Structures are given as structure tokens and as C-alpha cells.
């Protein structure tokens, strides 16, 4: 049996990835496909412990307090555990996987910590080798980038935090970091041929 498909819904924080992942999964299910939606980080799993520690500021209150390679490894290990324990076999047997974030998030969120273009390219090459070659995670068949302006996304982040009584994580609290990450997403989308979907808070 041929392998399944892996589709990624990608965007900056607060841009509606969870909603779009659910809607696409439901549409494909209704069309008769075997579909498994997944979300990263996998907060319900022990594998996300280092991610949770990083995002709540245990290693430093600024994203830049943890270097790109270390932070990327936290997220990659969480993905590896999810793949091996939750959806890898289904994918290998033909299921469609719809992921809310993936390696593509590591590409944007950690690359912005590197100001030199050569260092960013070296990081992206390392990440490709680390996650797809060394760890053996499957490569996406398509990436859909929800392109929402960071000011609009930040408004939604803060509204969601108030509604749920939560504290935004160290990425979400930093407006300048969110703006740089959004610019990185646009650059990556152009470089790697992601499908760009203009989005707004409406």
C-alpha cells in the first residue's frame, strides 16, 4: 500500500491554524478519506515537556535566551514521538495527515534568532538533515501558509488568553519577535513554494 499524504497548516501564532486544520480534516472525512489531524506541540504528551518549559520561560524570558539549534531540538523530539506513537503507522498505510504546525514552524521561529543570512541558511540546511534525514520524519506533500498580519494575530492572541485565563507564551508576548517571524514565514513560503492564503481576523 502506498504511503499517505502529509499536509501542513502553517502560520504565526494566533492565525487560526487550529480552526483551518479542523475544517480541512472534516471536509476530507466527509469525502470518504481516512484522515488523522495532529497538532504541534503535542501538549498532551510527555514528549513536549522541554517545549513547555521553553515557552513558559523556564530557560529565559526571551525566545533568544535559547539558541535556535537547542530550541529546534525540543520541538523536533516532540514531533518524533508523535510520529512514532500516534500517526506514523497510519501514514505508512495510506492515511492523510493534517498537521497544525510541523518542521516548518521550526524553520521560521528559530531562524529569526540568526541575523546573518549565511547562518540562517546553514541552520535551515541543518534542520532539514536533522528532522527529515537523521530522525526520519516524513516530508510534507504541501504546506498551506495562513498569511495574517502580525498586529491582527497579536490581537487574537491576547483576546484568546483573556478568554481562557491563560498567560501568553514567550513567543506570543513579544510583538517584535512575532513581526520578525511573520517576515520569515513570507520568505520561506516564497523560497519553498508553500501555498499562501491571505488571512485576516474575519
Spans of model-derived segments:
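Walker A (P-loop) phosphate-binding motif
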Residues: 1-27
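Residue-level preference for the first positions of well-ordered beta-strands
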Residues: 4-8, 96-98, 194
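NTP-dependent small-molecule kinase module
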Residues: 23-25, 151-202
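Glycine-rich, phosphate-binding/catalytic loops in enzymes
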Residues: 25-26, 54, 114-117, 160-163
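ATP-dependent small-molecule kinase phosphotransfer cores
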Residues: 31-135
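Structural signal for short hydrophobic segments within the conserved structured cores
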Residues: 36, 142, 195-197
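Conserved phosphate-donor/acceptor-positioning beta-strand/loop module used by diverse small-molecule
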Residues: 99-102, 127, 136-159
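Arginine/glycine-rich "motif VI" loop of SF2 helicases in the C-terminal RecA-like domain
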Residues: 133-137, 187-188
Amino acid at each position: 500500500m502506498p504511503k499517505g499524504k502529509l499536509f501542513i497548516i502553517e502560520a504565526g501564532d494566533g492565525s487560526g491554524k487550529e480552526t483551518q486544520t479542523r475544517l480541512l480534516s472534516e471536509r476530507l472525512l466527509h469525502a470518504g478519506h481516512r484522515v488523522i489531524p495532529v497538532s504541534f506541540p503535542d501538549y498532551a504528551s510527555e514528549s513536549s515537556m522541554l517545549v513547555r518549559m521553553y515557552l513558559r520561560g523556564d530557560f529565559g524570558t526571551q525566545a533568544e535566551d535559547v539558541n535556535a539549534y537547542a530550541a529546534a531540538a525540543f520541538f523536533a523530539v516532540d514531533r518524533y514521538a508523535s510520529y512514532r506513537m500516534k500517526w506514523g503507522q497510519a501514514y505508512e498505510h495510506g492515511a492523510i495527515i493534517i498537521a497544525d504546525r510541523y518542521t516548518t514552524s521550526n524553520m521560521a521561529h528559530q531562524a529569526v534568532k540568526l541575523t546573518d543570512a549565511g547562518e540562517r541558511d546553514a541552520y535551515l540546511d541543518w534542520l532539514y538533515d536533522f528532522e527529515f534525514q537523521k530522525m526520519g520524519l516524513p516530508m510534507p506533500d504541501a504546506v498551506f501558509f495562513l498569511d495574517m498580519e502580525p498586529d491582527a494575530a497579536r490581537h487574537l492572541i491576547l483576546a484568546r488568553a483573556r478568554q481562557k485565563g491563560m498567560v501568553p507564551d514567550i513567543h506570543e508576548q513579544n510583538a517584535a519577535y512575532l513581526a520578525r517571524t511573520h517576515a520569515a514565514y513570507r520568505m520561506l513560503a516564497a523560497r519553498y513554494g508553500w501555498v499562501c492564503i491571505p488571512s485576516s481576523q474575519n
